[in-house]
A protein has these predicted regions:
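N-terminal glycine-rich phosphate/pyrophosphate-binding loop and immediately adjacent elements
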Residues: 1-122
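Feature captures the FAD/FMN-dependent oxidoreductase FAD-binding
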Residues: 91-109, 134-137, 210-211, 215-216, ...
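Rossmann-like flavin
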Residues: 94-176
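A glycine-rich dinucleotide-binding beta-alpha-beta segment and adjacent secondary-structure elements
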Residues: 154, 158-168, 384-448
Length: 469
């Protein structure tokens, strides 16, 4: 069968494209190399508990807010979303001080002005930026760090407004203001957790895809995109099966996608060199904890904990874990106590490079000891805001950038895809279109990462595809 659209990769971007195109009446197939679809949205099960991989909270789902209309279109507003605390959806702890980030632009200013009264005018300017998001062509060339340090006089306040660093990679020399404000703005509008796993989103989208006649094929790993007359004709898999199509969308990292085009005559060398040369953001180390029953009351916010006021540079420290994000899973049984929390911290690929040739579950004792040490350090840091956490732990599971690489094909286990660079923005911001007229890209590597970024990019990919046709 020759499909109208062949989509490679079943992450959020791929599934959104598939749903929308299938509902337009096109014949669509989604090819997924893993046995379970969903990419970074999928959850995994251990000892009766479901754990999320990449989804922890979402911003801007309220009416009139950033993601509301898109999620309404996708049928995702019907899922059991729980709104986080308005007085402090994120609690930022730096050293021994804790500062809440409050929902709503006015409340955000009022709350932080209570700690920094002399910075109220600067906070109002900052919120104006969040409220009226600047055009990409202007803000992509501005350094986020330079902007913040010129706006605020108090270095501690720069650290506080930047402290949700686990949602993006903070690099003083390269992070564009565009990426920074888009990664924060929707969460200030409103922040939400799913009462359940990320699989709820995956299953909802797949249900709609199948209802519209689309197909999902798992355990189908692409190894080659075959060309004919300057266009992609088919995607060939490891088992020899080919999926023929008129249009192709890759929800896989662009560098991996180009690896399927080694003998391409349609792909020019300039484009290949550009994509190959792009750097990737850092990966994440995650500890998924199952807590003993009735030991920790549920907290309806996220906790960001830093050893000291070096939010922009803590990943460069050599003295152990310097920052951690703590996210609690909403109790699904109505309990007031939480059974599962995740701890996350950035992890350099240099800590993984000695194990790059290993497989999941077979990386050796040194790797396991390194993970245990890092997990202990994260828990110790988290105990600054959750006293006695270590004694509450029943079981724990860990993952590293190697895990992400092996499951999602993200080079170096990158958590946020290609690194955007304000010094060379045109090189690092990618279009859904490629030099091959019927091959398109989607996903977090193009313009913006995160749920919001991937959702908007998917709709942009669909629009590009329709204009090209």
């Amino acid at each position: 069968m020759k499909y109208d659209v062949v989509i490679i990769g079943s992450g959020l971007g791929g599934l959104i494209c598939a749903r929308q195109l299938a509902q337009q009446g096109r014949s669509v197939v989604v090819i997924e190399r893993q046995r379970q679809p969903g990419g970074c949205l999928q959850s995994f099960r251990r000892d009766g508990f479901h754990f999320d991989t990449g989804l922890h909270y979402v911003g801007g789902l309220g009416k009139g807010q950033t993601l509301h209309d898109a999620f309404e279109t996708l049928g995702l507003l019907e899922l059991p979303w729980q709104r986080l605390d308005a007085d402090g959806f994120d609690q930022i702890t730096i050293g021994r001080q804790t500062f809440p980030l409050a929902e709503g632009y006015d409340r955000f200013v009022d709350t932080l002005s209570g700690y920094f009264p002399q910075e109220r005018e600067a906070l109002n300017k900052f919120v104006e930026l969040l409220l009226h998001l600047p055009p990409m062509q202007e803000s992509i060339q501005v350094s986020a760090y330079d902007y913040l340090t010129s706006l605020f006089h108090a270095p501690l306040l720069v650290n506080i407004v930047s402290a949700t660093a686990m949602k993006m990679e903070l690099r003083r020399e390269s992070l564009p203001l565009f990426t920074f404000v888009y990664s924060l703005s929707s969460y200030v509008q409103s922040s939400w957790r799913l009462k359940g796993s990320g699989n709820l989103i995956v299953h909802s989208l797949i249900k709609d895809i199948k209802a519209a006649g689309g197909e999902i094929c798992c355990n189908a790993e692409v190894v080659q995109l075959q060309e004919s007359n300057g266009r992609i004709a088919a995607a060939r898999c490891t088992d020899g099966k080919s999926f023929e199509g008129r249009l192709f969308i890759s929800d896989v990292h662009p560098q991996v996608t180009l690896g399927w085009l080694t003998d391409s005559k349609a792909l020019n060398g300039t484009y290949r060199r550009r994509i190959t040369a792009l750097e990737n953001t850092m990966g994440m180390f995650t500890i998924s904890l199952v807590l003993k029953a009735n030991t920790l009351p549920y907290f309806n916010h996220n906790k960001y904990v830093y050893r000291k006021a070096n939010v922009w540079t803590f990943t460069e420290d050599v003295g152990g874990i310097g920052g951690v994000m703590i996210s609690a899973r909403v109790p699904e049984d109505g309990s007031t106590y939480v059974r599962q929390i995740d701890l996350m911290t950035p992890m350099s690929w240099t800590l993984c490079q000695h194990f790059t040739d290993t497989m999941v579950g077979r990386r050796g004792q040194i790797y396991e000891l390194q993970k245990e040490r890092m997990a202990d350090e994260c828990i110790q840091l988290a105990e600054g805001v959750i006293p006695g956490l270590r004694a509450m732990v029943e079981t724990r599971y860990t993952s590293t950038p190697l895990t992400w690489r092996d499951y999602t094909l993200s080079p170096f286990g990158s958590a946020f895809g290609i690194r955007k660079d304000c010094r060379n923005p045109l090189m690092t911001m990618l279009s859904p279109k490629t030099p091959i007229p019927n091959l398109f890209l989607t996903g977090q590597n193009l313009a913006l990462h995160g749920i919001e970024g991937v959702t908007k990019t998917a709709f942009n990919t669909i629009e590009s595809l329709e204009f090209s046709v």
